[in-house]
Regions:
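Conserved N-terminal catalytic core of the sugar/cofactor nucleotidyltransferase
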Residues: 7, 42, 47, 79-156, ...
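Short hydrophobic beta-strand segments in globular cytosolic domains
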Residues: 26-27, 156
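Short hydrophobic beta-strand motif reused across regulatory alpha/beta modules
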Residues: 27-33
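Structural beta-sheet core signal
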Residues: 51-53, 99, 150, 175-178
């Protein structure tokens, strides 16, 4: 199966491959690095760089599944999308996360608080009222005093965040945006 996926990804020059179940529904997204890597290598370049994950939205476009679970916990294969995003940052050494939560916040907190053996921390900021796409960042300014990443809880990109951090710092940029 690994060789088959690798061949298809090479043929189509793609960094990722969506896998569908028998009914044609998205079951998992496999990334190039997952196929070619024999072990998960964690560098510590970003060990002191926090990540803010925006997970407060209602996920209206994902209804009816988000009637039951928040979009941050929508599964892709074996893991919720927000955990996959966190794992991508952890591979670059990130150890500290802040999550902006609102809709079904208790489910997000319970899930992440019960992950066995996780090697990172998550502090939660709850919006008492919706503050917009990035409004809750203002609630975190007393906790974050250095360069940090911001990620939505529902967008996967295959990127080495260490490279992005080096680019950002080398150019003395105020803001660096990666979009998909």
């Amino acid at each position: 199966e690994r060789k088959f996926l690798l061949d298809i990804m090479l043929q189509n020059r793609t960094e990722f491959m969506p896998l569908l179940d028998d009914k044609g529904n998205l079951a998992e997204v496999i990334f190039w690095d997952e196929i070619v890597a024999h072990s998960v290598h964690i560098n510590n370049e970003l060990k002191d760089v926090p990540v803010v994950i925006m997970a407060g939205g209602k996920g209206s476009r994902l209804k009816p599944i988000t009637n039951i679970i928040p979009k941050a916990l929508v599964p892709l294969g074996e893991k919720p999308i927000m955990e996959i995003i966190a794992d991508q940052f952890v591979r670059c050494g990130v150890q500290q996360f802040f999550a902006s939560v609102n809709y079904k916040a208790d489910l997000i907190k319970k899930y992440f608080d019960e992950i066995p053996g996780k090697n990172y921390s998550i502090a939660y900021t709850s919006e008492n009222q919706p503050l917009g796409t990035i409004g809750s960042i203002s609630l975190m300014k007393k906790n974050i005093r250095s360069t940090f990443f911001v990620s939505n809880c529902d967008i996967l990109i295959d990127q080495d965040f260490s490279d992005v951090y080096r680019f950002h710092k080398a150019g003395s940029h105020e803001l660096t945006v990666i979009s998909a």
